[in-house]
């Protein structure tokens, strides 16, 4: 409680009361006017409201932006942490996004991945939310974090032999050609460039694709 004693009567122009040196975690309350009259007590109430935030996290593929192969940006589990304490968990939707509920602004909020979505490697990065109270002036605030992940990759190796049916001896087939493509694409021509490959077997009957994103080929 703050009181002002022996204040001169305001007359037609009221006094203005403002809060100064408000703690940074609070919204600065609006100024109020206060007329001062003879032998009357004028009362004004100020309420300190904590600044709050929500954060929208958007996950994308580190190389392409959108999901590659049969990998998915949906289903990744992230945690929001206060210091080193896990406060809540959230799961990415089909767009690789989630939005948190409101929390009190502070400088030690972070986002961390707990479980990656299908076809992606776990991201070990600790992402600062950007919820420092000095960044905001109002009660309800929104911030955003973009996070990226690396898709799993692998290759396919083939060894081709022939058997003339008489000797029963398998012979490496030099020059055998194979088209490899992501099954869900439907055909070789429909597959993305990084989701298909052509291999030609060498003199040992061996052929190997380039590294391709997670999926069934």
Model-derived segments and their meaning:
Residues 1-217:
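Solvent-exposed loop/turn and edge beta-strand elements of beta-rich ligand-binding domains
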């Amino acid at each position: 409680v703050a009181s002002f004693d022996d204040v001169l009567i305001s007359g037609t122009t009221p006094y203005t009361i403002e809060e100064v040196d408000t703690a940074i975690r609070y919204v600065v309350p609006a100024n109020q006017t206060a007329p001062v009259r003879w032998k009357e007590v004028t009362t004004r109430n100020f309420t300190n409201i904590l600044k709050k935030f929500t954060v929208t996290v958007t996950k994308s593929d580190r190389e392409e932006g959108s999901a590659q192969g049969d990998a998915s940006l949906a289903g990744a589990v992230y945690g929001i942490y206060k210091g080193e304490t896990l406060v809540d968990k959230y799961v990415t939707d089909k767009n690789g996004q989630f939005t948190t509920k409101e929390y009190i602004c502070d400088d030690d909020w972070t986002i961390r991945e707990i479980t990656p979505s299908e076809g992606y490697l776990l991201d070990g990065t600790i992402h600062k939310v950007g919820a420092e109270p000095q960044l905001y002036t109002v009660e309800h605030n929104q911030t955003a974090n973009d996070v990226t992940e690396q898709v799993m990759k692998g290759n396919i190796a083939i060894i081709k032999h022939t058997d003339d049916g008489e000797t029963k001896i398998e012979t490496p087939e030099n020059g055998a050609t194979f088209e490899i493509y992501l099954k869900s694409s439907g055909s070789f021509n429909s597959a993305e460039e990084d989701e298909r490959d052509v291999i030609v077997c060498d003199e040992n009957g061996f052929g190997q694709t380039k590294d391709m994103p997670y999926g069934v080929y």
